[in-house]
Amino acid sequence: TRNESSAASDVYKRQDDRNKLYLQMSKNSKFIPVIDELIGTYSFIDSKDNILWFYTTEGAPNGKIVNLEIKNGSFVWNEVIAESKNAIRSVNIINDSFVINYLEDTFSQISVFNLSGEFISKLSLPKQGTISGFSGGIEDTSSFFAVTNYVTPREIYKIDLTDLSFELFWKEELVGYDSSDYVSRLEFYPSKDGTQIPIHISHKKDLEIDENTPLLIYGYGGFNISILPNFSKSQTAWKNQNGVYAVANLRGGAEYGDSWHEAGMLLNKQNVFDDFAYAAKFLHSKKIGSPSTTAIDGRSNGGLLVAATMLQNPDLYKIAIPQVGVLDMLRFNKFTIGWAWESDYGSSDIKNEFENLLAYSPLHNIKSDVCYPTTLVTTASRDDRVVPSHSFKFAAKLQELQSCNTVSYTHLTLPTTHC
């Protein structure tokens, strides 16, 4: 904590955001359990005098702010800022104020509150997109934040927290690039069960789009990770080749808080594959590309997403690119850090979870009488997170059982890790 007379410590179990909380009252004293059950996330924000502030998801899937008052050796919890309909992405305390980054349909919205939890103002942002930054101390009066989106390279602004005014401090400039030559929009589509899924669609502004337009769809959908608007040179290169780039914000992520994550994990994992498949169906129905012009791409958990969705819907895509993917769902937990992913996937050592994993495990669902899309399987020689055997086994079996003339390639990068 700020006065160094006490310390807060978090204890986690597996790859799970829930944690226990312990407090050390002085440098040489023992840690005292404050939250001794895995009932939510507790993340320390800052402290002042005898008050410690935390972000928590206990009883608040979208997150809320609480404080812990230390009074005569006892602990008193108080709710400071209640849960909102929008998920909290980050919280900072600067100039005796909370600066909270909320996600509203995947876009950042910045709200400022005083330390009593009273709303002060909503920041008027320079652009719609993803905001990061706001580092600083409780007594600082200024800070910096960055903004980006699918067509805007990173811009950094300096903000005065006394009046919430800000000015451009720096921006990334690319030779020959003009963001006004591109467009990006957010739409929503129904998944298999009717759930509305956000999807960002970006391309050159003057592009004439039809069923022949090249379409690349990206997804992740797992581990409470939000995939937010972000500028990428490789995405821009695709757009410059007259392609449409789409990012589906699938269940399993954190875009709408813990409930969105839980709807795409464990026995609900199939929802994620359905969400991804219905993204292509939605775009094709709007005459944005067609199965013969569509590629899907994803990395790590997204590699699982691409492989599983491609196997379940081979007629939807021309090309699939599962990168460094988790592809053997019955043995992923036997290698390196794989055991930690059981929180999202489940364990093959538990009967009902085994049956669920077997139903979608890419390695175990390749059929011999199906023509699959052209597939580029990538892995890395020193990947100690998702070991290369996932990709090697999947690619070999796909090559063996492929029933038509489309091909699968394996690309091994040397000597790299999980990237």
Regions found by a protein language model. Give the residues of each.
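Single conserved hydrophobic/aromatic residue that forms the stacking wall/gate
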Residues: T1-A8, Y12, H411-C419
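Multi-bladed beta-propeller domains
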Residues: R2, M25-Y42, E69-N92, S116-G133, ...
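Conserved beta-propeller blade repeats
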Residues: R2, S6-D10, P33, E37-Y55, ...
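Short loop/turn segments immediately following the C-termini of beta-strands
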Residues: K13-R14, T57, L103, T148
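Structural motif
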Residues: D16-Y22, A60-V66, T106-S111, T152-Y157
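Structured, non-catalytic alpha/beta "coupling" segments that mediate domain-domain communication
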Residues: W53, N62, S142-S165
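Cap/lid segment of the alpha/beta-hydrolase catalytic domain
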Residues: W170-S292, R299, K334, G338
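Active-site-proximal cap/loop segments of hydrolase catalytic domains
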Residues: V247-L412
